[in-house]
Every structure is written in structure tokens, then in C-alpha cells.
Amino acid sequence: MSEIDTNDIKKEMDNKNYRDPTDNKELLKWTKKKRKRSNDSMHINNFYRYNPPNFKLLASKYPTFDKYIINKTEKIYNIDWKDSNATKELTRVLLDHDFGLRIELPDNYLCPTLTLRINYLYWISDQLKNLKIILNDNDNDNKIIKGIDIGTGTSCIFPLLGAKLFNNWSFIGIDIDDKVLEYAQNNITINSLNSKITLFKNEKNSDILLKLLNYKEGSNTFNSSNDDHQDNHDDDDDDEEYFADFCLCNPPFFKDLNENNNNKNNNPKSNCTGSVNEMVTDGGEFEFVKRIIKESFQLKCKIRFYTTMIGRKVNLNPLINILIKQYYLPKNQIQTTELVQGNTSRWVLSWYFLNKSTNLETKENNNINNNNNNNNNNNINNNNQFLTRMERRKLYREGITLNLDSDDNNNNNNNNNNNNNNNNNNNNNNNNNNNKIVEIIKLILDNNDIIYKTDENNIKYECKYLLNNVIVGSSIKLDRDIEFLFTIFIDLTTRLILFKPIDPKINNNNNNNNNNNNNNNNNNNNNNNNNNNNNKNNNNSCDGEIINSNLFFILKFLENIKNEIKLK
């Protein structure tokens, strides 16, 4: 090539802003833009949410990681995130330093990113707690939780992290490659977790989960010589209605090798290496998850909670439509969430089935349980349709009211109110308020017509909006260090805000009847009502908007819980 041609090429590269990969200054500029010191999208319990890795400390402690630092003259150390060897060593030292896990990560296999997977595990834990409430499960909180990892990989990352993060979790890891299972078994043995993790050898293109129905310890397992794990799974499927509490999966993305290669060419910043079995499957990610869905409708409640990661958002809604339209699964039994690490996002699709023995039914137009008052059926929308954010905000502005008193209770209360004086009325109101707290909680937990699928980040946003704009004057503050309180708050408020507004005609009719019966009381209590209205107006800056008293009672209930919980 002539000198003139070379100069022309350099000019063209300058015009197109090409970055020389050997230029460390340019590399540092790019990596500084990419790396964030905190990530509010991580799960609240994720260790790295407020404690990003200290590369300088890691480099001083691990010489094998120190050689990948590219900016030792800077205050904050960094690595080349496109270098697969650097990211692999980072994963290895983080597992050792922060979790006490020592693993071997062979070349040419997937290197797992930690924060996404930690978010995934904590999200599953949250959903299992919610599912326990929905199913009225009275199992001991320390009961062994059994998980199934579909495609466990050489690192066996989900079972290893799950066993470290949750003392009562155990796993069965499934894979189709003998060599992969050898590496995975070695990582399990190194960390002395044979008592919690078992590996299962499956065949390519065979059933993904159905074979586990006939699974027995020591049968078709990779580590069949292990005796320690047998105590945890000894014929549990015969004694219980379900075989496992949950399954999780990070499915292969691509249909074939050409699609994989095209993805690398279109995204030169991508650091994606892995074996063919890890990256490619017939039909790609969409068909693989479809197979899991199909098998789940054969297994039903044998696995309590089905989950899978989705790498391409374009596949999420079609898979949800398959669950709803093809298999007629109610929408309130489907959940999704987004997992975020830096600029990388993954999605999770999950669904569950209801046992026949539970009081909840799977029909879309069911009313709330008969254990609650029949009067509530008029106040709750019977259609399982997802509300948009604008619709929910409209609910906030209008205020949400739930008629929690039965007809009998209303009659009794009316008779009592007619006979009691003003002081007794005040006492009855206090007692009714206390009873209403219990009734609200019971109604929420027993109601099966609640739209339960919503994004976790949207939940937090909407709850914050609710606190700031509806519960005006409330002095209650959520302590982010209290996991239990925060989880309950998110769960209860999310369920409650998804109720449809009450028909004003129904309310007007009820109010007219009550007003006719209580004219005497209203005349006697005008002074008290005026005083109460003045107090409400002083506390409420919403220009006449109705404060949702039900949510206020829930918050007061949570405040009592908060006082009983010790801070971490």
C-alpha cells in the first residue's frame, strides 16, 4: 500500500472517530463513561448496590488481577471490559473476596456476571415470600427451599451463590455436557457444598424438566456417590405435593452460529464468549423458553414457581401471550422484572400454578373469597386487566375506598350508633379503625382477583408517588435497612393500588341509606365532624382530594411492625 493511501485511510478514520484499541488514553475515557460507582436499579439487598468493587484493593490482594489494571496512575482503578480474560479474573476474585467462593473458570465457556445473578436470586426469594402468602402456606420459614438450575454451566454460579446467600436453599443443577458437569462438580467440591448442590445429567433435545419427576438421589446424577445430599431430598416428592420450590434458567440466546457471529459483529463492544451449547439452541431463546412453558403445564404444581431470564426484550411479550392465550393462565399468576447491571439489562419471566386444595381459583373473573364479606364484591373490579400508570395515578387522585364491613356488621353498627352518645361513638370509631386494619390485611391476602404482575422498579416509583401525593401529612418513613418491612410495604401497597375505583352510584346509594338511618346521629355529631374536617383540611394539601384511609391504616400497621423489628 502506498504512502498516499495510508494517509487517506488515516484521514477517513479521523473523520469517523475511530478509536485505536491500543491507545490507553482513549480506552480510559471509554471505560470511565461505562463504569458507575453505584446502581440504584440493583436489588436493595444486593451487596454491590452501595459497595461497588474496589479495584485498587483487589489488585493489591490478588496479583493475578493486578496485571489487568489499565490505569494505575489514576485514583480509581479500572480494567478493559472488552477483555474476556480481565472480566473472568474479576469474577473469580470477587467471588473469593466477597463471598468466600473459589471457582475455576475454563476458557471458551461463559463467564457469569455477578450483580445480575444476585439480583435474580434475591428477586426469586421475594417472590417465594409473596407466593407463600398467596397460597396460605404455613411452612416453617427455615424449611429447606429446593431450586432447579436449568443449564448450570461450568461455574455452577446460581447454586453456589444461592447456597451462600440463603442458608436453607439447596439446588439441583442440570446440564447436557459431561465436561461442563466435571468443572461444575469440581467447583462444588472445592467449596464443600456437596450437601446442598446435586448435578443432573440430561440429554440434548430431550425434556428439560419432565425427567426430574422420576428423579431419585443416586439415579442419573453426575455426583451419584455423594451421600450427604441424600438427607435433604430423601423421597420428598412422595411426602409433599411439589418436587421443587422454583426453577431458574439463563437460556441460550441464538438460533445458530451465524446469528451468534452477526451479534458479535454488530456489537464490537460485546464481551460474549461461550461454548456452542451455552450460546446456541434450536429456535433460539424463544423456542427454548416455550419448551419450559409447555413442560410446566404438564408438571403444574410439582414446581411451585417457574422462572427464566430473557436476554431479548422482544421475546418477552410473545411469551406472556403464549401463557395467557394458548394455555389460559390468569394474568395475576404471571410476573416480570428487569435486571440491570450498568448498561446491560435482562428480563425475568415467571409464572405459577394454584393447587386445587387452596381457596383461590384460577378463573379470570373470580370474586374474592367467600370468607370475606359479600358486600366487597360490589367494590372490586372483576376483570383481570392491567392498569396503566395514568390509570393508577387517576386512582390516587380520586382516592380508593373499600367497603370492608358486611351487611350484618353495618346493621349492628347503625343500631349501636343510634343508642350511643358522642363519647361512645368516638370509642366505636377507634375500635372500628383497629378492626379495619385487620380486615384490610385479611382482604388483601385472601383476594385472588388482584393484578399481581408489575415491574419492581415501577412498584417503587408508584409507591413513592403514592406517599408523596396521597398520604399527605403522614410522618411515617420507611427504613431501607429493614428488609422485611420494605418487602411487606411494597407487596401490600402494590396489591391495593391495583383495585379499580368503586362505582360512584353504588357509593351514593349506600350513603343515602346510611344517611337516612343516621340522621339523628349526624345532628348530634355536627360539632365533632366540623372539628375533624378542620383537622383534615389542615393536614391535607391535595385541594379536596380524598386521602386513602385504607392505605393510611396499613402504614400505621407497618409502623407498629417497624417498632418490633431490630435494625440490622
Swiss-Prot record:
Where on this chain does S-adenosyl-L-methionine bind?
117, 151, 175, 250
The organism named in the record is: Dictyostelium discoideum
What EC designation does it have? 2.1.1.346
For this UniProt entry, the molecular function terms from Gene Ontology, in alphabetical order, are: nucleic acid binding; U6 snRNA (adenine-(43)-N(6))-methyltransferase activity
Question: The organism sits in which domain of life?
Answer: Eukaryota
Signal sequence extent? none
- According to the UniProt record, where is the region Disordered? 1-20, 363-383, 403-431, 503-538
Return the Basic and acidic residues bias intervals: 7-20
Top-level EC class: transferase
In its keyword annotation, does this UniProt entry include Transferase? Answer: yes
Q: Which CDD domains match?
A: AdoMet_MTases
| Primary role | RNA N6-methyltransferase that mediates N6-methylation of adenine of U6 small nuclear RNA (U6 snRNA).
User: Which intervals carry biased composition (Low complexity)?
Assistant: 365-383, 409-431, 507-538
According to UniProt, the name of this protein is U6 small nuclear RNA (adenine-(43)-N(6))-methyltransferase
GO terms under cellular component: nucleus
**Family to which the UniProt record says this protein belongs:** Belongs to the methyltransferase superfamily. METTL16/RlmF family.
